[in-house]
A protein has these predicted regions:
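N-terminal ordered "arm"
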Residues: 1-37
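A broadly used, surface-exposed interaction patch
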Residues: 31-66
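Long, compositionally biased intrinsically disordered terminal regions
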Residues: 65-218
Length: 218
């Protein structure tokens, strides 16, 4: 929401947690944050709202927020990951290794960009290099580096504090607050879960990026 206040965000959930979905610019992933509700809501929430209005509705002092009016959302808002059926996938390296992989990828991109002849320093050529680098998978997993890059850019891979305040984002339902970083899979979806939030994306090779799976009314 801080990156693009004009964007739309999807809210969904009910007692005891509320999930907020967004699609950050430049990353073909969905960002997911969840918060525990202090009191149950009268009915489940499932609507698309303005990211800027949602941000302005949050009162940090009282830890309260109002629900903005619904807006017509982008196509991705009707293509959300499944709520259940997630299983942990082995092989994910630790946060330090993931951070080093992202740093190495960024350094490679800069070096290759600087090595381009002047006449080839075009947007299309830089995009081609970026796609080649960020589509590589992390270690022995199916997770593309761009998902790890997105998680790091969003602050999801920062060190876990010794004590997490009550107002900190809660994990998805069924996951403890101290849950370590993990790679999960459900159907054609992958999710990189951290104590601060998750990034989700369709598995590599699925047509259309986020694709057209589980279309729901918006």
């Amino acid at each position: 929401m801080h990156q693009d206040r004009s964007a739309a965000g999807r809210r969904g959930g009910g007692a005891p947690a509320l999930a907020v979905f967004g699609r950050p610019p430049s990353f073909d992933i969905l960002a997911i944050r969840t918060v525990r509700l202090a009191a149950p809501v009268a009915m489940p929430l499932d609507l698309t709202v303005s990211a800027g209005e949602l941000l302005e509705s949050v009162d940090e002092a009282s830890a309260e927020a109002t629900v903005p009016g619904p807006v017509t959302g982008p196509p991705w808002a009707g293509v959300l990951p499944p709520r259940g059926g997630w299983r942990q996938v082995p092989g994910l390296p630790g946060p330090e290794v993931m951070g080093a992989a992202v740093a190495a990828a960024v350094a490679e991109f800069r070096a290759r960009d600087e090595a381009l002849p002047v006449q080839h320093r075009t947007r299309s050529e830089r995009d081609r290099i970026g796609r080649e680098i960020w589509s590589r998978t992390l270690g022995d997993t199916e997770l593309p580096l761009r998902a790890v890059h997105a998680a790091q850019s969003l602050g999801f891979l920062r060190p876990v504090r010794a004590a997490v305040p009550a107002a900190a984002p809660a994990p998805l339902p069924g996951a403890p607050a101290s849950a370590p970083v993990a790679l999960l899979a459900a159907g054609t979806w992958l999710r990189l879960r951290t104590p601060y939030g998750s990034v989700a994306m369709r598995r590599p090779g699925v047509t259309g990026g986020l694709g057209a799976l589980q279309v729901r009314p918006v």
